Amino acid sequence: MKITYITGNWAKVKSAKQILEPLGIEVYNVKMGTTEIQADTVEEVAIHSAKEASEKLKCSTLKNDTGLFIEELRRISRTIYTLCRWKNSEKTGVLKLLEGKENRKAMFIEAYAYCEYGKEPKVFKSITKGTIANKKSGKYGWSWDYIFIPDGYEIPMGNFPDEERFAMWNNDGLKELAKYLKKNEN
């Protein structure tokens, strides 16, 4: 069995291979653009992209979308989260929005949409809980890694090298996908 993972992120491919390939599920990587719709949930975005990629490539595809959801800012739309992603500094973005706020609880939700050609996508989710730091720190990773502190840690993920940082992420979505694929193997 094989799936085509649509992403330009080598770390995502590595995680998928570590979980799926020992079970006999080959993971191929294709970097291609898909339409990233504006939606209220990461599930909707992943579903749309997986289906679009499957129709274009005529094969089973895997596509994911990730969002950082901050309890204190839950009234703000996902569009604002996306805008903050690239303005992640002490002067703008999430840190600015959280200035003076006590509740800094946050979670990453990652939706994996698996789409067999000609069928409707199935979605599997991973949730990594944590808090938002008061200031950026670290030299590893990208984007949110510099401000997101996973539960059980005291400093942002950006302070940890790749292997340690990757181990902090919840991979339940990929594990559930693996179970689904094995159960429905033809």
PLM region spans:
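Anionic-ligand binding patches
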Residues: 2-4, 11-186
